[in-house]
Amino acid sequence: MLVVLLIAVLLAASPARADETCMSPYMPKITGQEDYVYVWTLGVDGVGDGSDKLVTVGANPKAPGYGKVVSTVSIGGRHEAHHGDFSDDRRFFWAGGLDDSVLYIFDMAGDPAHPKLVRTIDSFVRDSGGVVGPHTFFALPGRVLISALSNDRDQGGRTALVTYNNDGKFVETVWMPEKAEYGYDVRVEPRLNRMLTSSFTGHQNYMRDLPGLMGDAEAMKHFGSTMVVWDFHARKPVQTLEVPGAPLEIRWALQPRHNYAFTTTALTSKIWLIAQQDDGTFRATPVADIADPKRTPLPVDISLSADDRFLFVDTFMDGMCRVYDVSNPHRPKLTHEQKIGAQVNMVSQSWTGEHVYFTSSLLSKWDKTGKDDEQFLKAYRWDGKRLSPLFHVDFRAENLGRPHIMRFGQDRFYKNQIFEGS
């Protein structure tokens, strides 16, 4: 246990890393320049093969494939591809479909430029006892923890946390606690033996078209308004925090003496600080408005720099990225804002903070229409003051689909690994 804690602290403190800052602390980091950005992509009818796919884009400016599509792996059909992440050894990439709850496992180690689909798990709902909508995939030692959004009884927001081992065998289901039954993201801080979960909405809402949903007063009542603090090792809830407005992505601070996390609320457009108090409990406090909440800019993804100084906040409806100085986490200061596109969703930055990547798609039925339905991966350089464009991949022109979550890969990392059974 002490060794794991020391590793987590050292990884958090190192300024030389080039991996994403939101990765599981149980996962090895890649160092130096990332070679690839892996993009889990929703299929679009009439665009290419129309299927969900894992897209590999070159990210090393010294390589011939820089800023270009290197490879694609289609899975057949459209399943609402959304989130995914690596196993604790980064050998495999686990991904899921929010609609039919199928899991996909890709081998990344054999050829990092050309991932290979090696396993499909179509028993997630049955294995888990009725959980629907696998969302966040979080690496644990020898296991993958999956947060979810819904259930198969009423397709509402009651849901659970589900664990598989790295071989794809079901381990356990832990249902969300009473009066905090909704789920979304999950993040662990090993130093504190604390896990945080957030809350969104169920299948009956997220698979509905956005204008119709927002015009349905009853449906809009069925969004989460809580975060849960867990005893991580015991998998037991210890606190329920009131965070009105659908708290989404969670980002723990990365420096070893910073015992707090950030989230944003989609419906109320606020940055929230989830901070540990002197007595060990946590308190949730709104610390900043994001743009004009009355206009519902819809905050989606966030990314915290490795030094805990900058928080990048994407807002879907206006296509903006806003960068806040959160050196004082209680008083975020807006330092930069930039239009990324007609719509923007995910943001990923390298550990050094020099490279920041954006994708455009939120959900297949929530994305904009017509000329505003831009679908892209865009790369920028961040110099601490402003974002400068590096490259742009048009996922429609490339016949790929709707790009969502991103993860980084590197040839050198895999050449230096020895995997059991390989």
Where are these regions (language model features)?
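Asp-box/WD-like beta-propeller blade repeats and closely related beta-sheet repeat scaffolds
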Residues: A109-P190
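Loop/turn-rich, solvent-exposed surfaces of beta-rich toroidal or solenoidal domains
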Residues: S269-I271, K294-L377
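Beta-rich, blade/repeat-based domains predominating
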Residues: E20-P28, D49, G76-D88, R126-R143, ...
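Short loop/turn segments immediately following beta-strands, especially the blade-tip
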Residues: V57-G65, I105-P115, L273-A284, V323-R331, ...
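Blade-loop segments of beta-propeller domains
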Residues: Y66-T136
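Beta-propeller domains
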Residues: S87, K179-G183, R187-C321
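Short, conserved, GDST-rich strand-edge loop motifs in beta-rich repeat architectures
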Residues: G32-D49, S147-G157, S198-H222, T359-L377
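Beta-strand-rich domains and repeat architectures in extracellular enzymes and scaffolds
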Residues: D19-A59, G65-L98
